[in-house]
Structure formats: structure tokens, C-alpha cells
Amino acid sequence: MTEQEPPAPLGESGSVQPAGAEGVASPWLTGPVGGVSAASFFSDTGHEMTTAVLPSFLTATLHASASALGLVEGISDGLMGLAKLGTGPLANEPHRRSRFASGGYLGTAIATGLIGVSVAVWQVGIFRALAWIARGVRSPARDSILASLVSPLAYGRAFGLERAGDNLGAVAGPLLAAGLITSIGIRPTLYLAVIPGLFAVVAITVAARSARQSLPTAGGAMRIEFGRIRRAGLLRPMVPVAAFELGNVATTLLILRATQQLQSGGLTVTAAASFAILIYAVHNAFGAAVAAVGGHWVDRSGPRIVFATAAGLYVVAYIGFALPGQGWPTLLVAFTLAGSGIGLAETAESTLVARALPDELRGSGFGLLGGVQAAGDFASSAVVGLLYAVLSPVVGFAYAAGWMLVALLGASQLRATQEEGAGN
């Protein structure tokens, strides 16, 4: 670690312990921290409006299959991961982060809105991929900005708040979509998704300006320094993180499963789609609440137990999605468990990176994390979508649950590596 960002000591439980009076008294909930969370809220509102409508748009309007939906999501996730991995080192330099964050949020907003003009599946795939590439460009920069704004004692709470904002946007987006598609139709709803994204650009620009003023101009190398990242103890925990992401089914497939289950229960296509979107909003509401609470939990107990709990919740959730002939109560429980799981997992993973690395390496670290996440998401979306369409939804969700079990068993790597990283 450098003198610029000294490591906080770790207790036996893996939680960060007070390093001194200054660290204890330092406030963490500031305007810039709130601005980062607001950017996540507005951006997620926009692209989750599209995510909620996409299954019906592809399958009902463009007459595509579940495998096409999985392929679109999988390719987009894969490209987002490459963008995170490639641009993460560029975010090592504090004064470059603002441009990458603002530009990424702007690109996400514009490309998401353009999905509405698509008349073929390949066009949806292109615009979705462009939006997700922009998300990949912005993410390491945003996370590095956020880590630079708070004390190491408050990393969990800060990232929990950011994840809460993200998930609250994922509540507002589906709710807006559910109301808009019944009044103005699917395509106009897709067009309007650009508006919240533009608010996100303003919010992240203001937050980044504050972070830029508080850090020196000099930054880290413009490449991923795997040697330093390995010595910081961050490579081994990527194994259970990868297993988790290999089991992290795209939310569009969860919405599709709910829609089909509700249709089999007697609802029309439109009614089933609207109801499924509303249940998905509950998923995201729990994700927001649990992320905020989970951030405090991570600061007290460390990422390991929080991550393991997330994987366990997903195993149970996938059982609910796999069971055939289920009505809305079972689907609601399954969505709630999955939402809680993602709220805990993302907070734990981001906190792990922020604790392990100094500021001049965090862009690379967050890029590496994002690359692992997106590579796993690509494989999960593609494979589960194929199994879903060719064999059965039961097989697809059983496959995903198996990977979550692997992540649960491998969660011990997060604690061991965290302790090693503290000594560097």
C-alpha cells in the first residue's frame, strides 16, 4: 500500500477496525457520495425501463425466441466485461476518471433509447451491446471515484448506498415501463428511456469534480499490473466471484420465466408481462434495501459472510424459478430472494476491491472485477438461455443453482485473501 491510501487494519472477523480518531470521525455520507448514488439511480431507471420491456419486445413484437434473448444479453454482458477490463487501468489516474464516467453514462443513455427504433433482433443486439460497452467504460471510473471519496472504514456503506441507488432505479424503471406500455406502447416507452440517463450524466459529473479536486494529479500505470494485484491478494477471490457470475442468470430470463408461468395460469400476454414487471420491481426494491443494510454488515463483518449469504439466497431462488406451474406467490418469493442476493453480492465484491488496493491501482482492480463479472454473465446468459429453450427451464435453472453452490463453497477465499492483502 502507498502512503496516499494506507490500509485499514483488519480484525479477526475480517472487518475494518478503527485506525485512529480521524478515521472514526470522518463523515462518509457527503454530497459527492450521494451524487454517485444518484447517477446510478437515474441511469438504472433508464436502462431498466428497457430491460423490463425487452423480453416482450423481442418475443412478441420481433418474434424472437428465449435463446435469442439470452444471446443478446450474453453478448452484451461479454462486451461490457471487455470494456471494463480494457478501460479499468485508464481510471487509475484520478483526473481521467471524470471523462470516462461522464462519457460512459452518456453513451449508455443514448444507445438505450435507440433500441426503440429496432425492427430486427440484430439491431436490438447492436444497440444493447453499445449501451453495455458504455456501461463497461464508466464502471471502473465511477467505483474508483466513490472509493476516493470515503474512508476505508466506510467502503461497505458507500458501495452499499451506490448499489441501493442502482437497485432503486431498477424499481423505478420497471414501474415506469409497466405503466407506459399500457398507455403509449412498447416503442415509445423505449424512446423515453433516454431521459433518466441524461440526469445521470449531470449527477456523476458533479460528483467526479469533487473527487478530482481532492486527489493529486499523478496516477497509476495505464495497464493492468497483475503482479501488484496478485500481491495484494485479489486474484484468488476472483474464483468464487466467477462461479457466482456463471450462475447469475440475466434478469430478462427471470422476467420471461415469470411471464410464461403467469400466462399458463390464465393471464393474457400483456397482463402477464405487466405483472411480471411489477414482481421484478419488488426484486429490485429488496436489492436496494438489502444493499444498504449489507454495506453496514460488510463494514462490521467483512465481505466473506455477506458473499456466502448471497450465493445461498440464489440457490433457493432458482429452485422457485425452476418449479413448473407456479403462481405469483412463488414467483414473488423467488424474485425477492434473488434481489436480496444481488444486493449483498455486489456490495461485498466492490468493498473487497476497494480494501485490497491503493487508489492508483483501483481502476485496474475494478476493471478486473468487472471483466470477471461480465465474462461469467455472458456464459450464464448464453448457456442458461440455450438450456431453457432446447431442454427446459428446469434444466437451465438447475445449472445456474449448481454454480451458486460452487460460489458458496468457495466463499472462504474472500476472507483469507482479505487478510493477506492487509499486510501488503
PLM features: residue spans?
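Juxtamembrane intracellular "pre-TM" segments in multi-pass secondary transporters
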Residues: 5-30, 209-240
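Helix-loop boundary and gating motifs at the non-cytosolic
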Residues: 23-77, 235-265, 269-272, 276
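Residue-level signature of mid-helix packing/kink "hotspots" within the transmembrane helices
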Residues: 77-85, 170-171, 284-292, 377-378
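Helix-to-loop junctions at the C-terminal end of transmembrane segments
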Residues: 83-96, 181, 289-302, 388
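Cytoplasmic membrane-interface "Motif A"-like loop-to-helix N-cap segments
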Residues: 93-105, 299-311
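C-terminal ends and interior cores of transmembrane alpha-helices
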Residues: 106-119, 312-326
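Intracellular juxtamembrane helix-capping segments at the cytosolic ends
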Residues: 137-150, 344-357
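Symmetry-related core transmembrane helices of the 12-TM Major Facilitator Superfamily/SLC fold
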Residues: 188-205, 396-412
